[in-house]
Swiss-Prot record:
Organism of derivation: Phocaeicola vulgatus (strain ATCC 8482 / DSM 1447 / JCM 5826 / CCUG 4940 / NBRC 14291 / NCTC 11154) (Bacteroides vulgatus)
Subcellular localization, as worded in the UniProt entry: Cytoplasm
Gene transcribed to yield this protein: argR
GO annotations of cellular component type: cytoplasm
Family assignment from sequence similarity: Belongs to the ArgR family.
Protein name, entry field: Arginine repressor
Pfam families: Arg_repressor, Arg_repressor_C
Length: 158
């Protein structure tokens, strides 16, 4: 049985990556990911996540996460299970001794927490927002070295 937290994460991922207009559709998407739950449980989860409905660009009403009514949907389709395995990681870019990691909304602070708690020699510290992390990289460390260290937390970083 999958945990409530992973179910809530899956709901967030599905809502932010697909246009879902009904609880029935959402239950079907969750079933594809291996989650079995009742409509009543889903309703409570949606309330806890403060999910609302808003008009999409094509005029249909779809579920949206709070503060993300005009949320940019991903063009590449990934399953919620794939996204959960990757800590919401999207990309990393480097500039001098800084790196910027882009994540799915809501994932940056937990990923930064994991990075900070690993005490990587290559990374002095992080600053995280909702979907962006800035890494301060120790002088003399290579980009490959940073990516290699981060691969312990983010398997799909390479």
């Amino acid at each position: 049985m999958k945990s409530k937290n992973s179910r809530l994460d899956a709901i967030k991922i599905i809502i932010s990556s697909k246009e879902v207009g009904s609880q029935e559709e959402l239950l079907q998407e969750l079933a594809k990911e291996g989650f079995r739950l009742t409509q009543a449980t889903l309703s409570r989860d949606l309330k806890q996540l403060k999910v609302a409905k808003a008009a999409s660009m094509n005029g249909n009403y779809v579920y949206v996460l709070p503060n993300n009514t005009m949320y940019k949907r991903m063009t590449e389709q990934h399953s919620a299970s794939e996204m959960l395995m990757h800590n919401g990681f999207i990309s990393i870019e480097f500039s001098a001794n800084l790196a910027v990691i882009k994540t799915r909304p809501g994932y940056a602070s937990s990923l930064a927490y994991d990075i900070d708690n690993r005490n990587f020699d290559e990374i002095l510290g992080t600053i995280a927002g909702d979907d962006t992390i800035m890494l301060v990289i120790r002088e003399g460390c290579t980009r490959a070295g940073v990516k290699n260290a981060l691969s312990l937390i983010i398997p799909n970083i390479q």
